[in-house]
Amino acid sequence: MTLARFVLALVLGALPEVVGFDSVLNDSLHHRHRHSPPPGPQYPYYLPTHQRPPRTRPPPPLPRFSRPPRALLAQRPHALQAGHTPRRHPWGCPPGEPWVSVTDFGAPCLRWAEVPPFLERSPPASWAQLRGQRHNFCRSPDGPGRPWCFYGDARGKVDWGYCDCRHGSVRLRGGKNEFEGTVEVYASGVWGTVCSSHWDDSDASVICHQLQLGGKGIAKQTPFSGLGLIPIYWSNVRCRGDEENILLCEKDIWQXGVCPQKMAAAVTCSFSHGPAFPIIRLVGGNSVHEGRVELYHAGQWGTVCDDQWDDADAEVICRQLGLSGIAKAWHQAYFGEGSGPVMLDEVRCTGNELSIEQCPKSSWGEHNCGHKEDAGVSCTPLTDGVIRLAGGKGSHEGRLEVYYRGQWGTVCDDGWTELNTYVACRQLGFKYGKQASANHFEESTGPIWLDDVSCSGKETRFLQCSRRQWGRHDCSHREDVSIACYPGSEGHRLSLGFPVRLMDGENKKEGRVEVFINGQWGTICDDGWTDKDAAVICRQLGYKGPARARTMAYFGEGKGPIHVDNVKCTGNERSLADCIKQDIGRHNCRHSEDAGVICDYFGKKASGNSNKESLSSVCGLRLLHRRQKRIIGGKNSLRGGWPWQVSLRLKSSHGDGRLLCGATLLSSCWVLTAAHCFKRYGNSTRNYAVRVGDYHTLVPEEFEEEIGVQQIVIHREYRPDSSDYDIALVRLQGPEEQCARFSSHVLPACLPFWRERPQKTASNCYITGWGDTGRAYSRTLQQAAIPLLPKRFCEERYKGRFTGRMLCAGNLHEHKRVDSCQGDSGGPLMCERPGESWAVYGVTSWGYGCGVKDSPGVYTKVSAFVPWIKSVTKL
C-alpha cells in the first residue's frame, strides 16, 4: 500500500484489518497475481468479437483465489490448483443475493447468458438456474460461499473472479442524526462520494431504502471535503426511485473534472407515510424483508414486546414498511435480542391499520418484558409457488390457488391425494387438512397452472412435489382442487386482507366503505350489497354488534376509484377479501352507487313527546353536528345534523311520493313552509304527507317517519301572482303534541323574536334541503353556509319585488356561489344564536335562477310573522 493510499484509508476509516503489516502491503486492495490460461477448447471460452472490451484497455488482473467454485476446480490452471492459499479476508456479503456486478478488482461481470457454451459443459445441476439469465450479478451457484462471476479480458477470453459485496454499500456521514448526511459509496476498497449533478429525490429515496431508513428521501447537497482526499465515484445518477440498491440505477462513472458548485450528493430520509406514523426498521434478519421490529421514538430506537404479538400485527408492520406478501409474526427474540428500550407492549392490531400507531397498545415505554421477548416479523414477497385458499368462508378453506408470473391460478384434481392436501395445508401454516367438494366454492375464471401433482408428504413446499410443467393440463375449472385446513399452533398464512375504513358517518362505526388497494383508497359498488356484506366489513373492523348495509351513496359519494363490485359474502367470512368474486377495478357503477355500512346497529329510537313547557328546552338543539356536505355550492350534511329539516311530499295518488318542498319542524305537530308550495296541487290535505327524520330519500331509516296532514294554513295576505307573504303552516295528524316523536334526529327549531334583525343578532347561517345540486336532485340532505346580505343588494337587483318581509342571502363571489334551488322551496334558513341554539330566520322563497352571479336568494323573513305563527299554532 502506498503512503498516499494508507493516509487516505486512515482518514476514511477504511484501513484493512492488520493481520501483519507486511502482508497488508503485499496484498493491497487490487491484487496483482496473474496466471496463464490453460490449453484446450473448453477453457477459456473466447467471446464473440462484438462482446470484447477494446484492445486499448490493459488486461485486468486476476484476484488471489481463497476458495474457487467447486465446479471450476478441474478447469483451473494447474499452478493455481497446487499453489498457495492466500490470506482469507471477509468479503462483506450479507445473506441473500447481492446486487454487485463487478469483481473485487474492478472487472465488469458478463451476463450469465453470454457464456452459454461454458455453462452447458458444467455438470452441476445447481447451475441450471443461471442458464439464460440476462443479469450479470455475482452469484454462488455451486453452494454457500463467496459469490463470483465471469468476466472477459481484452483478448476476448472468459475468466472468472470473486466479488466484493461491499462494493456499492452506502452510508451517510456528517449529518445531525442517522437519517441525514452526505452520501458515501464503497468501491474498490475505499469510501467515496457522489457528485450532486442531477441529484434528485428519486435518487435520495433509493439511498434511504437501501439503508432501511424509510422509503422517502429528500435530495440535499453538501460541500466537498476541503482535504480533497475523498474520491468521487459517480455523477448524473438517474434512479427511477424503486430500485433496491444504488448500483441498479443508471449513472455516469466520474471522469474527473469539476463537479457543479463543488457540491456532493446528500440526503434526508423519512418514513413515506408521514410524521404521524412512527419510523420502523427490521434488524437482524437475512434480508430487508425480515427482522426484529424496532421503532424510532423520542430520539432513540427500541423494540416491541411479543405479548399478544400475532400475524395481524405483522401484517400492519409489513404494510407500513411497504412490503407486501406473506406477513408472519415471530416471538422470543427470534432475530436476536435488541439493546435499546422496549417501546411498546400488548399490541393488538386487527390487520387493517396502516400504521402500528393506529393499533390498540400500551403507552410508549409501558411494558413488563425483557429483550428475550422482542417481537419480529417476516414479510415474504409474493413469489412463484405461493399458495392460497380462495372462495371459502375464511382463509382456512376454499379453492387452492398458486401464484405464478404475477397471476393466481388453480390446481387440477387429477391424481390428488391426502398427502397433497397435507403438504398444501402445512405450507399455509395448518397442521391438518382434507379435500373439500368443489361444489362448495365458486369456479375460478383464471388459468389452471398445475396438474398431476404428487406429493410424498415430506415436502415443506408445494412446489417440491412432482407435477407437470406450468400451464400444462387437460382439465376444466370443474376439476379445481378445493381443500379445508385445520389450525395448528403456528399460523403462517398468506394474508389477503387489505385496509378498510368508513368515511363521512356520524361516528367511526358507520360510513361509506372504502378499501385501500394498489396504493389508493377507493369505494365499493352497491350491486348486491346486503347486511351479510356489512357484517363482514364490521367484523374486519372489530365490531361485534348487528350490522346494516346502506346503498346509493347513503353517506355521500366517494372520489377515488371504484375498486370492487358484486361482493358476495355469506356473512361468516374473516375479511372482505374472502368475498370478492370479481376482478379488482371491474365494475359498471358510478359513485352514486357507493356502498356503506352501520356497525353496532341497534336502531334505538326516542319516543318522548313534546309539550309547551319542554319545547323551549329542546328547540334549536343540534345533537349531531360535528361534520359538514350540497345545495348549489354546498356539501352533504351530517345524518341527524339538522333534526328540524322535514320534507313535504305528494301522496302516491298524485305521483310517486316525490319531494315537493322542504319544511321546518316547529313542534311535534306543526311545520313551517312556503305558501307557494301549494299552488299547483291545491291545499287539500289528502294530497300531502310530511316526512320527518329523513336523510337519504331512497333509503328507509330508523328515525324516519311519514305523517299525514291534518290542516294547511296559508297566510291570508298571500297571492299566487306575488312572492310576498310567502309563508304557510301545516298541522300534522295526531293527538296534541304527539304527532312526530322527538329523538336525536327529530327535534324542533326555535322561532326568532318578533321583528328581530338577524343581520345584527345572528351568525353562522345555513340553508339545507334535497334540491338541485347543479347536476341533479340530491338523494342525501345537503347543507351550505350562506351569509346574510344587506337588503340593498336585493333591492337593487329585484326592485319593487323585494319587500320588508323578506331576507336577502347568498354569496356573490364568482368562485363561491351558494344558493337554494328547486326542491328546497319552503326549507329553512337557520342561524345560530348565542348559547348554541338554532332559530329559523328564513323560509326559502324565490330568486332568479340557481347560483346565478349577482342574484342572491330571497327568503321569507320569519321574524316578521312570529305573532301570526303563534296565534295559529298556540306555541
UniProtKB/Swiss-Prot annotation:
Annotated EC: 3.4.21.-
Annotated positions for site Reactive bond homolog: 630-631
Alphabetical list of SUPFAM superfamilies matching this protein: Kringle-like, SRCR-like, Trypsin-like serine proteases
Signal peptide limits: 1-20
Location in or out of the cell: Secreted
Intrachain S-S bonds: 93-165, 109-149, 138-163, 195-259, 208-269, 239-249, 305-369, 318-379, 349-359, 412-475, 425-485, 455-465, 525-589, 538-599, 569-579, 619-750, 661-677, 765-831, 794-808, 821-850
Primary role: Plays a role in neuronal plasticity and the proteolytic action may subserve structural reorganizations associated with learning and memory operations.
PANTHER family according to UniProt: EGG PEPTIDE SPERACT RECEPTOR, SCAVENGER RECEPTOR DOMAIN-CONTAINING
Protein name from the UniProt record: Neurotrypsin
Organism encoding this protein: Trachypithecus phayrei
